[in-house]
Amino acid sequence: MKKWLVVFFLSASALANPQQELNQRLGMNDGFSANFNQTVTSPEGEVVMEGEGSVDIARPSLFRWSTSLPDENLLVSDGKTLWYYSPFIEQVSIYWQEQAVQQTPFVLLTRNQSSDWENYQITQDGNVFTLVPKAADSTQGQFQIDIDAKGIVHGFNVIEQDGQKGIFKFTDMKLGKPAAARFTFNIPEGVEVDDQRN
């Protein structure tokens, strides 16, 4: 009986299409915290930038992305509003999170909504899922998510239309929903505010 169940579940898993499989894997964990390393390469493969920082994600739609190198930047979403803070230029820009979804597929990792995935052609190669926008007039390139069968995201790649590639690798992964306070942002005194919500 046990062998039959194992075969059944393996067969059912094999029948899932890449979109369903990605959706299922992302739904396995409700959040995580990690450090990340970032490498940006030119279309010719030369390293043009390296960076590092930390990330907190809680589903649905909460995230905190903090870059410490090469420049300090902070991106925080409470599920509705997105704040982008750059201490160097002493400015915070404010957006609706819906605006961010249209600009960066990274936000898709935090939402995992079927309606979002329908905008992409999704293919799977092992644990790497590649998303290509379906819209012919899209300015987005490809987005690749490295997520294992236990739902642990190991990293992602952003491949621009010109061939430039951003590679993000997660380390020191801690599964579980981070504290709610990680997803709030208080505007520091004296900084310029650029409110893009319309």
Curated annotation (Swiss-Prot):
Q: Fetch the SUPFAM superfamilies from UniProt.
A: Prokaryotic lipoproteins and lipoprotein localization factors (SSF89392)
Keywords of the record: Chaperone, Periplasm, Protein transport, Signal, Transport
Superkingdom of this entry's organism? Bacteria
**Signal sequence coordinates:** 1-16
Q: Name one GO biological process term.
A: lipoprotein transport
Q: Which GO terms describe its cellular component?
A: outer membrane-bounded periplasmic space
Q: Where in the cell is it found?
A: Periplasm
So where does this one cross the membrane?
A: none
Q: Does the record's keyword annotation contain Zinc? A: no
Q: Key word Membrane present in the record?
A: no
Return the Pfam families for the record: LolA
Q: Which InterPro entries match?
A: LolA/LolB/LppX, OM_lipoprot_carrier_LolA-like, OM_lipoprot_carrier_LolA_Pbac
What is the documented function of this protein?
Answer: Participates in the translocation of lipoproteins from the inner membrane to the outer membrane. Only forms a complex with a lipoprotein if the residue after the N-terminal Cys is not an aspartate (The Asp acts as a targeting signal to indicate that the lipoprotein should stay in the inner membrane).
The UniProt similarity line reads: Belongs to the LolA family.
Q: How does it assemble?
A: Monomer.
Annotated HAMAP family: LolA
What PANTHER family does the database record attribute to this sequence? OUTER-MEMBRANE LIPOPROTEIN CARRIER PROTEIN
Q: What is this protein called?
A: Outer-membrane lipoprotein carrier protein
